């Protein structure tokens, strides 16, 4: 339904996340070039607040790697892949690996992050339908 370039653009525009991700309370872009986007995402979900920063290495329009630069984790890394399916569609894949920096944070934020990871791709596909209406 949507091209790799369209989906890549939605993922890269993290400043738009608060418009369609209910858990996202804000986003600050620190740097954006053709190959890197560095940003901080603010989580505000059912009264739980946290933030984390990543540096995302971009290979337009097919891949993006996320690497933690700051936040309540010992590590966090992720990978987006946008694989073309014909001329006008793509397969969207997202993987996220993380470990919280304490058991308490894991207990509080773990369910929130599980929810985020499990609904992330679907949220972007729904957003694409709003941003790129079909002719």
Show where each model-derived region lies.
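Short, surface-exposed helix/turn micro-motifs that flank interaction/cofactor sites
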Residues: 8-12, 83, 125
